[in-house]
Amino acid sequence: MSLDVNASEVLRIIKEKIKDFDQQIFSEEIGEVISVKDGVVIACGLENAEFNEKVVFPNGEIGLIQSIEYDHVGIVILTNTQDIKEGDTVRRTKEALRIPVGKKLLGRVIDPLGNPLDGAGQIFADAYSPIEVKAPGILDRQSVKEPLQTGIKVIDLLIPIGRGQRELIIGDRQTGKTTIALDSIINQRDINKNLPDEKKLYCVYVAIGQKCSTVARIMKTLQEQGAMDYTTIVLAGASDSAQSQFLAPYAGCSIGEYFRDNGMHCLIVYDDLSKHAVAYRQMSLLLRRPPGREAYPGDVFYIHSRLLERAAKMSDKHGAGSLTALPIIETQAGDVSAYIPTNVISITDGQIFLETELFNKGVKPAVNVGLSVSRVGSAAQIKAIKQVARSIKLELAQYREMEAFAQFGADLDETTQALLEKGKKLTELLKQNQHETLPVEEQVVLMFAANEGYFDNIDVTGISTAAKNLLGSFRLYHRDLLEDIKEKSIIGDLASLSSALQGCKTTNA
């Protein structure tokens, strides 16, 4: 029996059969865990792995590739390491580590992976951003030109900070470094009050290797001061792994960059980068990288430079947003010439140097005006401050120098005695209690009064009270002059200000 085969019919049947065939082919690169030790996994088989790539283990644990050798890769574990064992598979994701960013994170405390730590529920973020982002290029930036008011007299008047600047806060332990950073955050409360959302300054506080009790106290302070509404805290505590502490500042920076890249403004505090360098050293030694000076790896400068270069004032073409960084470095016995301090000093745009000796004398904030500098902030300083604070830094530096000679008990001429007396009064005038920030217009009035000789006949011990009384009188009777300075950023009517000052002098005498 013959069978007629119609070729076209067969072709039609085959076409119909494969028409709805939609089998997709997935390619995966899977490696095998060779060893697990101290939060570091050595794996083989990931031949095309990339540096800083996210990898996933069977139970959902996340790792980050931090070392690529000829026949294996080094992976740091970012989650629980207990469930990972020798022989487990590890899978490439071909993507970078991403974290949630946006306004939904304001008022929250999170870990470096974006998980909430405050018990206030899940975070539904506006967007996700990679932790590692390339810093803006030269053409994407513009020079710093807007002031960032900290509310701290000695900083706003003598060591001004501009939006988009990197200003280092450096000093020994217990000298008030964190207090300066917190006061800078708290001062934005009143500034933000009457501004639209896109003009407000948002804040990110990154706690690296801090005790959880310390961070809880910081959070409570910010809540009491009404500052948590515009602040996010990123916490990698002292009990967290070295890799978590290493990632924390990069995660915080990505959160800050969301505001910067959307035409808004953000202030980020890294507290502190000394502990960050120690965490990176620990991680690098576990990855068998060769140690260098003080056992830090050779690229320890790069980990801080690539982080701090992400702070910038963006060009008008890119929205004119800004990210201002206040990194903190803890020194040992005032040694600013150590490895990490000199690295960060060379990266930043200036430093605020805090001294134990001044702190112990009761000068708070304990800022050494002679050693502190702001390399770009003066361009952002408002004209009113330039009018009153031009000579103060020099006078204070001369006072510190003369004070050393005066201790020898030598007979001093009248000019030197006058310089010492004025220096003491200026130092007293610049003292400030923590969390008692001053608006810029009131700082201008105080310095104008000092220049006009308002405090000349007042004893050093009475300077603080006299300054409070003066500001109280201005708030009560001369609010219009304060508002004029605030709005115009310049002392427009010198005669009226001098007249008001004389009136206060008579009233408070």
Curated annotation (Swiss-Prot):
Gene3D superfamilies assigned to the protein according to its UniProt record, in alphabetical order: 2.40.30.20, ATP synthase alpha/beta chain, C-terminal domain, P-loop containing nucleotide triphosphate hydrolases
Domain of life per record: Bacteria
Pfam families: ATP-synt_ab, ATP-synt_ab_C, ATP-synt_ab_N
Reaction(s) the record says it catalyses: ATP + H2O + 4 H(+)(in) = ADP + phosphate + 5 H(+)(out)
Alphabetic keyword roster: ATP synthesis, ATP-binding, Cell inner membrane, Cell membrane, CF(1), Hydrogen ion transport, Ion transport, Membrane, Nucleotide-binding, Translocase, Transport
InterPro entries on file: ATP_synth_asu-like_sf (IPR023366), ATP_synth_asu_C (IPR000793), ATP_synth_asu_C_sf (IPR038376), ATP_synth_F1_a_nt-bd_dom (IPR033732), ATP_synth_F1_asu (IPR005294), ATPase_a/bsu_AS (IPR020003), ATPase_F1/V1/A1_a/bsu_N (IPR004100), ATPase_F1/V1/A1_a/bsu_N_sf (IPR036121)
Membrane topology: Peripheral membrane protein
Signal sequence range: none
Subcellular location: Cell inner membrane
GO MF annotation terms: ADP binding; ATP binding; proton-transporting ATP synthase activity, rotational mechanism
Site (Required for activity): 372
This protein's GO CC annotations: plasma membrane; proton-transporting ATP synthase complex
EC identifiers of the protein: 7.1.2.2
Chain sites annotated for binding ATP: 171-178
Protein purpose: Produces ATP from ADP in the presence of a proton gradient across the membrane. The alpha chain is a regulatory subunit.
PANTHER family per UniProt: ATP SYNTHASE SUBUNIT ALPHA, MITOCHONDRIAL
Family membership: Belongs to the ATPase alpha/beta chains family.
Subunit structure: F-type ATPases have 2 components, CF(1) - the catalytic core - and CF(0) - the membrane proton channel. CF(1) has five subunits: alpha(3), beta(3), gamma(1), delta(1), epsilon(1). CF(0) has three main subunits: a(1), b(2) and c(9-12). The alpha and beta chains form an alternating ring which encloses part of the gamma chain. CF(1) is attached to CF(0) by a central stalk formed by the gamma and epsilon chains, while a peripheral stalk is formed by the delta and b chains.
Xref: NCBIfam families: atpA, PRK13343.1
Protein's recorded name: ATP synthase subunit alpha
Name of the encoding gene: atpA
